[in-house]
Each structure stands twice: as structure tokens, then as C-alpha cells.
């Protein structure tokens, strides 16, 4: 599993950082956790990019306790 920690990243830098992360791992079947913290704006930026790449994702863990990350497979 790969992790991208966007916590404390300025929103303007999230999109290019995430795109670079995705493209470096494209079609490798890598499970990835994208750490967003609890910022709704940060999550919205990440989800928009994941949608553009048509990647399935889940926000947080199954129990709904930790909602500060987004899980996907690249």
C-alpha cells in the first residue's frame, strides 16, 4: 500500500501533487491511502481528481471512525 499525505498541504498544491502520485503508479494495481485530514475542501479536490481518472474510492474506514483519508486502487 502506498500513502500520499496531503495533510498540511495548501489546497492549491493538492491537485498537481495528487496527479503526479496517480500517474507514477498508473495501472500497477496499487492500493493507496490519500491522507486528507478532515478538510471537506481537501476531500472534494481529491475526489474530483479521482473521478477524472475514473478511479473507485472510499472515504474513511469501514467503521466510519477515521474519515481523514480516501482509499483507492490505482
Residue positions per predicted region:
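Long, charged, low-complexity intrinsically disordered regions
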Residues: 1-74
Amino acid at each position: 500500500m502506498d500513502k500520499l499525505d496531503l495533510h498540511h498541504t495548501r489546497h492549491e498544491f493538492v491537485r498537481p501533487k495528487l496527479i503526479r502520485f496517480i500517474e507514477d503508479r498508473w495501472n500497477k494495481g496499487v492500493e493507496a491511502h490519500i491522507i486528507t485530514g478532515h478538510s471537506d475542501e481537501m476531500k472534494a479536490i481529491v475526489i474530483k481528481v479521482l473521478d477524472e481518472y475514473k478511479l473507485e474510492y472510499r472515504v474513511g474506514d469501514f467503521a466510519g471512525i477515521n474519515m481523514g483519508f480516501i482509499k483507492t486502487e490505482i
